Amino acid sequence: MLIPRKVKHRKQHHPRQRGIASGGTAVNFGDYGIQALEHAYVTNRQIESARIAINRHIKRGGKVWINVFPDRPLTKKPAETRMGSGKGSPEWWVVNVKPGRVLFELSYPNEQTARAALTRAIHKLPIKARIVTREDQF
């Protein structure tokens, strides 16, 4: 799982989900990528599930890059707890994804297999996304 080793503050405010991504919108390392089309919080478990889906489909001969890191904690109070008595304990780690952000990149020789692997990964994510290639950008 992707979680920060050490953080300055255990609990953070939730960022507003607005605007579009200013950086990380291009495929830099691989040949194909998954680009977000809407706002969402993507958890560390969803990122890991998508990574496993890609790796199981391509088996060997390819390389996967994860371009996002879940660095924000989301808190939750226990069930059947009365209101008040402070903020809950950190439960998940999420990344605030904005439209245009490239989440995963993949380098693989066969385009059809690469697109199939990325499609499987998109189904694991809680956002609408599309597959982009390095040639699409320029």
From Swiss-Prot:
**What PANTHER family does this protein map onto?**
50S/60S RIBOSOMAL PROTEIN L16, LARGE RIBOSOMAL SUBUNIT PROTEIN UL16M
UniProt organism field: Mycolicibacterium paratuberculosis (strain ATCC BAA-968 / K-10)
RNA-binding among the record's keywords?
yes
Protein's recorded name: Large ribosomal subunit protein uL16
Tell me what gene encodes this.
rplP
* Assembly description: Part of the 50S ribosomal subunit.
Question: Which residue stretches belong to region Disordered?
Answer: 1-22
Please provide, in alphabetical order, the Gene Ontology terms of the cellular component aspect for this entry. cytosolic large ribosomal subunit
Q: Name one GO biological process term.
A: translation
Q: What Pfam families does this protein's entry cite?
A: Ribosomal_L16 (PF00252)
> Which intervals carry biased composition (Basic residues)?
1-17
Q: Which UniProt keywords apply?
A: Ribonucleoprotein, Ribosomal protein, RNA-binding, rRNA-binding, tRNA-binding
